[in-house]
């Protein structure tokens, strides 16, 4: 995947998970949540204000010491994501933000979660796993077979798209390297639809009616 333009202060991710973190502390406030995450070696070189994708959610480091980092999560993010559901001891997918010169694997992920959705069905094959995820009808227009989606921060290819659900396939590397390997039918996942697809779809929806008015 080649990005045609990366702003100097881009807070971008690729959906290639670098490791798993562990929730050490979670405290609810009236307007949000504070999380402390054990990042292990991924905490090396961390700075205040750095961006880290935690289960696909772009969060800002507000405090750190050794191998852990703290993040403040606003209510709007909690409403859209599964971060509020994470318990102490839970594991999360971790990706540090993209730096100039990094390999551009996966696809462009912004860390801005669109919604959370529950796994409906899991189909296990000898080595791989297909998961079916619920899909509210108004999100359907952003998904196409073979298109991109970030699921809990993991860059995945869409396999099937139906009116109320879609599927992705997980290879052994993804199952072992990310938290998706432990996901069950009760698991809620963070979804971020491909940004370029959203821009195209929303632009067409906005412009096409005006164009049709002129030609009819």
Task: Kindly give the residue locations of the regions a language model identified.
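Conserved loop->alpha-helix
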Residues: 2-216
């Amino acid at each position: 995947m080649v990005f045609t333009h990366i702003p100097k202060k881009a807070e971008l991710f690729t959906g290639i998970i670098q490791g798993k973190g562990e929730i050490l502390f979670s405290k609810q406030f009236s307007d949000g949540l504070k999380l402390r995450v054990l990042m292990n070696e991924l905490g090396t070189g961390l700075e205040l204000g750095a961006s880290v994708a935690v289960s696909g959610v772009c969060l800002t480091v507000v405090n750190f010491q050794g191998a852990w980092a703290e993040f403040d999560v606003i209510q709007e993010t909690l409403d859209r994501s599964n971060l509020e559901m994470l318990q102490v001891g839970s594991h999360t997918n971790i990706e540090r933000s993209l730096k100039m010169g990094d390999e551009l694997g996966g696809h462009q992920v912004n860390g801005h979660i669109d919604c959370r959705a529950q796994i409906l069905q899991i189909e296990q094959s000898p080595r791989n796993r297909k998961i079916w995820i619920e899909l509210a009808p108004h999100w359907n227009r952003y998904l196409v077979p073979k298109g991109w989606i970030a699921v809990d921060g993991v860059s995945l290819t869409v396999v099937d798209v139906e009116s109320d659900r879609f599927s992705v396939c997980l290879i052994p590397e993804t199952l072992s390297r990310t938290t998706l390997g432990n996901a069950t039918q009760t698991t809620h996942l963070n979804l971020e639809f491909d940004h370029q697809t959203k821009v195209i779809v929303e632009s067409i929806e906005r412009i096409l009616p005006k164009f049709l008015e002129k030609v009819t």
